[in-house]
């Protein structure tokens, strides 16, 4: 792979407005991929003529901190959706995938040893508004509290995905 792609999440909304936010830096980041998932930029053409160009996570370091941006992470292993129709099982796979990304970041990129409890922000995208309460309660059972967790109703990149999580961790460097 010749490029380092950004961490990214793309979801649909009910409104007519396009909303984009991004963080830019002059320094390149370090891309992180989940060893249990096909990298999105290598997806087979059955998903899209042009594969999405993003890293599963990106590490950015400066003199005072290390930031891990985790792209929207869903219930996908290899390139296949798992647990169609079961939002709580999909949530568990999302969390497991984020744990793998954190472990890979630590092992392959000498990133600070962190765990899910160290995440400073989670955005949880839920397809069906009726699932908000069960997703919130199950997530709390799985990982406990995260300082900032936002639950957002959104259309996800595949019809059979019901939940997706984007995460952020910031660690001071010594």
Enumerate the language-model features and the residues they cover:
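N-terminal presequence-like segments and the immediate start of the first folded domain
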Residues: 1-174
């Amino acid at each position: 792979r010749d490029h380092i792609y950004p961490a990214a999440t793309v979801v649909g909304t009910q409104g007519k407005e396009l909303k984009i936010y991004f963080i830019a830096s002059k320094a390149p980041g370090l891309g992180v991929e989940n060893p249990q998932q096909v990298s999105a930029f290598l997806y087979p053409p059955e998903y899209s003529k042009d594969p999405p160009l993003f890293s599963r996570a990106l590490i950015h370091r400066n003199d005072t901190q290390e930031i891990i941006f985790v792209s929207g992470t869903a219930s996908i292993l290899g390139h296949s959706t798992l647990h169609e129709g079961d939002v709580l099982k999909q949530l568990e796979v999302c969390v497991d995938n984020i744990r793998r990304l954190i472990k890979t970041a630590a092992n392959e990129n000498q990133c600070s040893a962190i765990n899910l409890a160290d995440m400073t922000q989670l955005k949880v995208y839920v397809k069906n508004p009726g699932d908000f309460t069960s997703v919130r309660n199950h997530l709390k059972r799985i990982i406990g509290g995260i300082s900032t967790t936002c639950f957002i109703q959104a259309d996800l990149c595949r019809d059979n995905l019901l939940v997706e999580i984007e995460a952020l961790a910031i660690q001071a460097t010594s």
